[in-house]
Swiss-Prot record:
Biased composition, class Low complexity, residue ranges: 32-48, 374-387, 766-778
UniProtKB keywords: Repeat, TPR repeat
InterPro entries given in the database record: Glucose_repression_reg
tRNA processing recorded as keyword: no
TPR repeats: 263-296, 379-412, 583-617
Record protein name field: TPR repeat-containing protein DDB_G0287999
Domain of life: Eukaryota
Cleavable signal peptide: none
Spans annotated as Disordered: 32-55, 360-387, 639-660, 761-797
Coiled coil location: none
Length: 1204
């Protein structure tokens, strides 16, 4: 276009303008200025240039033709002024303009045509490139598939040829397996077989233990008919398959004379074919041999095999339905109703579950979930509510595939025909699958038939909670919205059968647990049921649980809107399904479950909700909740001393039977009236007053509630503390204000004091009240159980026991003078259940800004010998805890100065303490922080003397000795360590022996790996390392020992020197002094080496010759020869070999990770060594060592074949 314009400009000379039209000599054209035209940066090819020239020629030709037709072509226009153009008519000018417009249109069309041609050429080239790439890709894929197919066929042909070769040999007599006898892998099992056959002294259990050593999972199955020799053959099959020699495994498989005992081998062979990807061979092998073994293959083995096939098909993108059909065709053989019974229903259901399509939320719901994850906290709850109300949706493909995979008609018919053969767990699993399937596929008939089976044939008392939860899910979530008849049918069925249920039925408890579950967000109820539901796979109620939060505050972290939404859905379900007169019983029982599960807040929520809805009489639930909580928390262990009525003795035994609803009507009519009056007063007189002053008064009252303790409380104090109780009328406001940290004790004490206050209003004085209670005890026996009525708070209160928290007052002057700390400490209610309740209460007390303890009185109490001698370990710890005032954080000795200031720890106190506790309790005390105190302070406090005096009374000193060493108890200081060690030596020389050489326990601790043990101190903080004082302590005490021990003692224990050397070597290794350790080793005769010594030697050699492996092997082999030579000289050839294999070889094997075991195996006569192992086996040989020695075979086998 630009080139054309330039050409035209050059040709245009002698222009003359007429009414906006430029007349050109020879031709005319309308020219306009295009200010927006941009020049192209692309390079024009020769082809494009030629094309452009031809186009211009055509264009010129068209323009000339037009101008020839014009009457103006005869007129030559020269450059003249405008007035010289006068004389032309309007018509002539218009004709000329029209021709000019035609010319312009022709040019425009030509340009469009040219652009289209260029685009077409580009598109054509792009398509050609794509076609070329596609062809190359297809060619490459085809080549890879052919290559893979060839490889697979080659492998299969190779395996089949080997199998045919083996099968063609008559009785395998011509097959030479003698080469196997020369390899260590196979010599060990043959030795084992000979050993088992020839050894008559071992029991069957010992033989099983030996055979079990071949397996990492331990003992062989305890099946009576299994022949040990045949079972060992499966060991050989497994060994061959591990080294990819299936032909040898097949040899042993076919060699078995009794095929029925070799089912293990069959499964191993099939698993091997699956592992190498030869599914056809696996199925063929399975099908050919299945008939011989189907009666012996366990359900678990079937399941493992099936899972292996499914996993393979998924990993390799095989058709899962083909795999499934092949598998079931082999097992079922067109007779499903008979053979499928051999299939454990639970396993079958689990298989179905493993390949069941999972629910995927619809796109709009997923969007809500995505929005929720990206939104701020203010919008989280709204999205969750939207999400939680949606129905389950499954696409047609999902349902279709599911129907292909599982024939539920057959499954259901099997269930109906074999109902009595199933356990309750199996029924639960299979019914869950059927229910789930019917919901997914919207099969109303199957769903109703199944529910009818659950409710009618099974009876709801046999229905477990997950089934009920599925029905609840179906009712509220999963039933398709276009199937209202399903909801109606379900409601009808549930309502009819729940209405006639007796409270003794199991189903009664199940429904109550279901209610408790839907109100509980923590504890055993929640966890156990939630796990079961997740296992079944039904979409459960979505609850935002944060597992890292303390249970006591978990519910407060859940989003309020979501919680209420789900709870309300469940309440609607309960109220629409359950008959009105039955809801109360279920809710009452649910309350019991919640309370027993320590879900107090949830119980209160449940209680308040039904009170608010009016479907349950609030006061009745309140009474039962209050009484039960009171029993469980406050006076669980106290006896009812004031109950003089013998008729009630039997009823008192029912106090702990919290699961029977009939035992909770223990309040007399007078109690009901009193509490009902109180309750009505609260409900009717509540006024919502926003006055700040009144709110502050209420908060002050609430704060006072926290510090009311257990035990007897003076009514005068209550009157003073709760003078504003009438204004604080609504108990619900108390719950709401303490939702963040509601403590059951707060609630109980709050209720207790309110009731006492009401009783004070209704009765003249306490004496009259007590008299009334006694009268009630005599007159209200028909009310059943418990305390026989009356004011339970007063009749059950121990008169002489004051609570510790009652000492918390506004000032010390208010401390009751009658309280004795011995009574506090000896109150058993403080120490029951491993002090759980007490610790919780104590912790809140000590952390409270209002807490004040009479430390001086506690000090005087603790420093009294008669007191401390009668105290238990736990009681003393709590007293010290109180003095330390650290809030029960298990480090109350941390600040020694604080303890010294607040408590006079006398030597007498410590000696009394540590001489009465056991060794474990001493260690516990030490762990709690005494190790942070310097030995000097320990000595000055007398604690050290007390510790050792307690130790010397206990014969088991090794744990404490190890503990002392690990914690660096004996450090570099002026502290007289020698005298204490001397005390131990003088008392029990064996104690000192263990004290100095806990190296054996190191083997147990670190699994026998000396390298890990030697690095142990490096992983710890340097100030707490065990070996900080090692250099100057243990070696020095070797001399101490010998000085304290007589020559006779040493001669009686010749291994002492070895043990001391071992510990010296280990100490030097940990100090990094390998040269000194090596010298110590060389100074010790090899004949005195034991297993620990050899382990240390191998470790040091591996470090010393780390850069020269050949030198290392030479030294090790030389060492072995020296050891055997010295041992033979000392104890004879046979004993020496037995000793060698018992200790030396064991150490080499235990520490194989620290040495070049590959090279050692390659250079040592391994078959001879293994033969020596066999020769060393004797009836009195350590069974554990037998197991370890045979486990060596697996490692040597692996290493040997990797090298060869």
């Amino acid at each position: 276009m630009i080139t054309l314009r330039k050409s035209l400009s050059k040709s245009c000379k002698d222009l003359r303008i007429l009414n906006g039209t430029t007349y050109v000599k020879g031709f005319c054209s309308t020219t306009t200025t295009d200010t927006t035209t941009t020049t192209s940066t692309s390079t024009t090819t020769d082809t494009d240039t030629n094309s452009e020239k031809s186009n211009k020629e055509k264009l010129f030709h068209q323009i000339n033709e037009l101008t020839k037709q014009s009457s103006f072509n005869k007129v030559l226009f020269y450059k003249k002024s405008a007035h010289e153009t006068e004389g032309y008519s309007y018509k002539e000018r218009q004709q000329f303009k029209q021709k000019q417009q035609k010319i312009k249109q022709i040019k425009h069309n030509q340009q469009l045509k040219q652009k289209q041609q260029i685009e077409q050429q580009k598109q054509k080239k792009l398509e050609q490139q794509q076609q070329q790439q596609q062809l190359e890709l297809e060619k490459k894929q085809k080549f890879e598939q052919q290559l893979e197919q060839q490889q697979r066929e080659q492998n299969q042909i190779s395996l089949l040829e080997k199998s045919k070769d083996l099968e063609s040999i008559n009785d395998f007599g011509d097959f030479d397996f003698r080469e196997l006898e020369t390899k260590p892998l196979f010599s060990v099992p043959n030795v084992l077989i000979n050993y088992l056959e020839n050894e008559k002294t071992l029991s069957d259990h010992q033989k099983s233990d030996v055979v079990g050593s071949f397996y990492s999972d331990g003992e062989i199955p305890s099946v009576p008919h299994i022949n040990l020799e045949e079972y060992t053959r499966s060991v050989l099959i497994e060994a061959y398959l591990e080294v990819c020699k299936p032909e040898y495994a097949f040899y042993y498989f076919k060699q078995s004379e009794n095929n029925k005992t070799n089912s293990k081998g069959l499964l191993l062979m099939i698993e091997f074919y699956i592992k190498i990807g030869d599914i056809d061979s696996a199925f063929k092998f399975f099908e050919v041999n299945f008939k011989d073994y189907k009666d012996l293959i366990s359900t678990n083995d079937y399941y493992k095999l099936f899972n292996g096939l499914i996993t393979y098909s998924i990993d390799n993108q095989e058709n899962i339905f083909d795999i499934k059909n092949k598998f079931f065709n082999v097992i079922i053989n067109d007779n499903i109703n008979n053979d499928i019974e051999k299939f454990n229903v639970g396993s079958l259901a689990s298989m179905i579950e493993s390949i069941t399509p999972k629910y995927q939320p619809p796109p709009q719901e997923q969007q809500l979930m995505d929005d929720d994850s990206n939104s701020n906290s203010n919008n989280d709850s709204n999205n969750i509510i939207k999400n939680s109300s949606s129905k389950l949706e499954f696409n047609d493909d999902c349902v279709s595939n599911y129907k292909k995979l599982v024939n539920f008609d057959q499954l259901y018919s099997i269930y109906k025909n074999n109902y009595k053969k199933y356990t309750s767990d199996q029924r639960l699993i299979i019914l869950s699958c059927i229910l789930k399937y019917s919901i997914i596929t919207a099969d109303i008939e199957l769903f109703l038939n199944t529910v009818n089976r659950v409710l009618v044939k099974d009876g709801i008392e046999k229905v477990e909670i997950p089934i009920l939860q599925i029905l609840f899910e179906a009712y509220t979530h999963t039933i398709p919205s276009d199937k209202p008849e399903l909801v109606g049918q379900l409601k009808y069925l549930l309502t009819n059968y729940i209405k006639d249920m007796d409270s003794s039925d199991n189903g009664y408890k199940s429904i109550s647990k279901l209610i408790a579950y839907n109100f509980s967000f923590k504890g055993d109820i929640k966890n156990s049921i939630y796990d079961q539901l997740c296992g079944i796979g039904i979409k459960s109620i979505e609850i935002d649980i944060e597992n890292n939060i303390e249970n006591s505050v978990l519910i407060n972290k859940l989003k309020q809107e979501q919680r209420e939404k789900e709870r309300n859905q469940f309440i609607i379900f309960i109220q629409s399904i359950f008959p009105e007169d039955r809801i109360q019983h279920f809710v009452e029982t649910a309350l019991i479950y919640l309370i027993n599960d320590n879900s107090y807040q949830e119980a209160v929520k449940l209680y308040i909700y039904f009170l608010k809805e009016g479907s349950v009489t609030g006061i009745d639930i309140f009474l039962k909740y209050h009484e039960l909580s009171y029993k469980n928390i406050v006076y669980n262990n106290n006896n009812n001393n004031n109950n003089n009525n013998n008729n009630n003795n039997n009823n008192n035994n029912n106090n702990n039977n919290n699961n029977n609803i009939k035992n909770f009507t223990t309040f007399s009519e007078n109690d009901h009236k009193t509490l009902k009056t109180f309750w009505e007063r609260i409900k009717n007189n509540y006024v919502n007053n926003n006055n700040k002053q009144q709110q502050q008064e209420e908060r002050d009252i609430e704060n006072e509630f926290i510090f009311i303790g257990k035990g007897e409380i003076n009514n005068d104090q209550l009157l003073e503390k709760f003078q504003y109780i009438k204004e604080f009328r609504n108990i619900k406001s108390f719950f709401n204000s303490y939702e963040e940290n509601l403590n059951p004790n707060d609630f109980i004490n709050y209720i207790k004091n309110i009731i006492n206050k009401v009783n004070d209003d209704d009765n003249d004085n306490d004496n009259n009240n007590n008299n009334n209670n006694n009268n009630n005890n005599n007159n209200d026996d028909d009310d059943g159980g418990g305390h026989g009525g009356g004011d339970v708070f007063k009749t059950t209160t121990p008169k002489k026991v004051k609570p510790l928290i009652s000492t918390i007052q506004k000032s010390q002057n208010e401390l009751p003078t009658t309280t004795t700390y011995k009574e506090i400490i000896e109150n058993t209610s403080f120490f029951r259940n491993q002090q759980y309740n007490f610790n919780r209460e104590l912790s809140s007390t000590l952390n409270s800004p209002k807490s004040r303890l009479d430390l001086e009185r506690l000090q005087s109490f603790l420093n009294c010998k008669s007191h401390t001698e009668s105290m238990s370990f736990q009681q003393l710890c709590i007293c010290l805890e109180l003095v330390g005032d650290t809030g029960f954080k298990y480090d109350f000795y941390k600040n020694l100065n604080h303890i010294q200031k607040t408590l006079i720890i006398t030597p007498q106190l410590c000696k009394n303490l540590f001489s009465t506790v056991t060794m474990d309790e001493s260690i516990d005390i030490l762990r709690r922080g005494l190790s942070r105190i310097s030995p000097e302070n320990l000595k000055s406090l007398g604690i050290w003397d007390g510790v050792f005096q307690g130790l010397l009374k206990d014969p088991l000193k090794t744990p404490l000795a190890n503990f002392l060493m690990y914690n660096g108890f004996i450090s570099k200081s002026s502290f007289d360590r020698y005298s204490y060690c001397q005390q131990i030596i003088n008392t029990d020389i064996d104690a000192y022996y263990f004290f100095l050489d806990p190296s054996i326990s190191y083997y147990d601790t670190f699994g026998g790996d000396i390298e890990d043990a030697s690095n142990y101190n490096l992983k710890k903080d340097s100030s707490k390392t065990f070996f900080k004082p090692m250099e100057d302590f243990f070696i020095t005490y070797l001399d101490t020992f010998f000085k304290a021990s007589s020559p006779h003692e040493i001669s009686q224990r010749p291994d002492y020197q070895t043990q001391f050397s071992n510990y010296t070597i280990l100490s030097l290794i940990r100090l990094g002094k390998l040269n000194e350790a090596f010298k110590e080793i060389e100074s010790l005769s090899p004949a005195k080496y034991n297993a620990t010594t050899i382990g240390l030697v191998v470790f040091i050699y591996s470090k010393r010759y780390k850069q020269d492996k050949s030198k290392f092997l030479v030294e090790i082999q030389s060492l072995i020869q020296r050891i055997i030579f010295d041992l033979e000289n000392k104890m004879g050839s046979e004993d020496a070999r037995s000793y060698f294999h018992k200790y030396i070889l064991k150490s080499l094997i235990i520490n194989y990770g620290n040495i070049e075991m590959d090279n050692l195996i390659a250079n040592v006569d391994v078959p001879k060594v293994l033969k020596d192992i066999d020769n060393s086996l004797a009836p009195n040989f350590d069974r554990r060592l037998i197991r370890k020695l045979f486990k060596v075979r697996g490692y040597i086998k692996y290493r040997f074949y990797r090298l060869n």
